[in-house]
Amino acid sequence: MHDYYRRWRQQGVWEQVHHTLRQKVRVAAGKTDQPSGAILDSQTIKTGDQACASGYDAGKKIEGRKRHVVVDTLGLLLRVIVGPASVQDRDGARPVLQAVLLGFTGPRKIWADSGYAGALVQWFQAQAGPRDCVLEIVRRLEGVSGFHVLPKRWLVERTLGWLVKSRHLAAITKRRPTPANQCSI
């Protein structure tokens, strides 16, 4: 069984299955098969003792890994990259954004929270090149304190909430990040 899983992972079968299912769900929901918008976020997850590539997220005070995700406007996963929790969100976003630019023709706008503001926006514009795609920072409303739902951002938060409900994804115990990426898909 493990040999099949490993072989399919190496051959990209899992990613192709996910891609096909996502397209079918989008079409069934009345959308085009390619997303026109996407949302970026990250989530720090505790790891087991034997997990490698873990780090310490000083902001959240958690030892573990960080899951960088991009979802479409239905909350369906487009790309997931798992790395050490010590990587800043702006730095960890680069590979996942690059994967979205390479893997999808559709997104014209990608929304992100203010943690991604700054040099990442200029870097993204350079990577997008002539393609009509922008990284838009969704800022908190001024004068509003406490929790407040931000436009588009709630979609990625809902998806991350779904992922945490899975026993296998709530705390990563795998030795390598690759199976964790695959489990997220």
Model-derived regions, located:
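Short alpha-helical elements
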Residues: M1-I185
